[in-house]
Swiss-Prot record:
The keyword Cytoplasm applies. It comes from Syntrophobacter fumaroxidans (strain DSM 10017 / MPOB). One of its GO terms (cellular component) is cytoplasm. The gene is rex. The lineage of its organism: Bacteria, Pseudomonadati, Thermodesulfobacteriota, Syntrophobacteria, Syntrophobacterales. This is Redox-sensing transcriptional repressor Rex. Homodimer. InterPro entries: CoA-bd, NAD(P)-bd_dom_sf, Rex_DNA-bd_C_dom, Tscrpt_rep_Rex, WH-like_DNA-bd_sf, WH_DNA-bd_sf. Modulates transcription in response to changes in cellular NADH/NAD(+) redox state. One of its GO terms (biological process) is negative regulation of DNA-templated transcription. Keywords: Cytoplasm, DNA-binding, NAD, Repressor, Transcription, Transcription regulation.
Length: 210
């Protein structure tokens, strides 16, 4: 499914809508109005209708959205109607915690490779059954296990080198937790995660917000 360029804020909200709808499914909710969905997602109903309108017509006027149907439609829009294989590079405290987090599998993301340079970690088996490979093996393992997305949790000094290796291995999507901006070709999409930036926003609102 191909669409024109969509604002990133819309894509992020679609993820929020989908997770909220999945929670509603667990509560046996079959149909929901845009007003109720908006309230639970922290947006206004017009925003939901606008976001969905980028991709077609959804729901029934005066009735609302069929929850299961809308979940499946959003999954298709986001490309989540298929599994995605992940590789973790850097098994320090953060990387180890993330790779153990069950929420990834719940949403269709599966770790199929893990890498580190520490000889005390390389060769060890993780709770999910993965054996930690040395970073020197990255390209071969990435291709063998058909990894789609690389996650970097290395120190900043190593992040660019790891990004280069991931790109050479054919990876076009990187989630970067290292506290540094990495440079990649245009064909590779990078999402940077820096918790301190979120804290800066909170600090601002606590200091000057109403």
């Amino acid at each position: 499914m191909k669409f024109a360029k969509i604002p990133m804020a819309t894509i992020i909200r679609l993820s929020i809508y989908m997770r909220t709808l999945q929670e509603l499914l667990e509560d046996d909710v079959d149909v929901i109005s845009s007003e109720r969905l908006a309230k639970q997602c922290g947006v206004n109903p017009a925003q939901i209708r606008k976001d969905l309108a980028y991709f077609g017509e959804f729901g029934v006027r005066g009735v609302g959205y069929r929850v299961n149907e809308l979940v499946n439609q959003i999954k298709e829009i986001l490309g989540l109607n298929r599994p995605w294989n992940l590789a973790m590079v850097g098994l320090g405290n953060l990387g180890s915690a993330l790779i153990r987090h069950g929420n990834f599998i719940k949403h269709g993301y599966m770790f199929t490779a893990a890498f580190d340079v520490d000889p005390q970690k390389v060769g060890k088996r993780l709770p999910n059954g993965l054996v930690i490979n040395h970073v020197d093996e990255l390209e071969d393992v990435i291709k063998e296990r058909e990894v789609h997305v690389g996650i970097i949790t290395t120190p900043a000094s190593e992040a660019q080198s790891v990004a280069n290796q991931l790109v050479l291995a054919g990876i076009n999507g990187i989630l970067n937790f290292a506290p540094v901006q990495i440079q990649v070709p245009d064909c590779c999409h990078v999402e940077n995660v820096d918790f301190t930036i979120k804290l800066d926003s909170i600090a601002y609102h606590l200091s000057f917000g109403s």
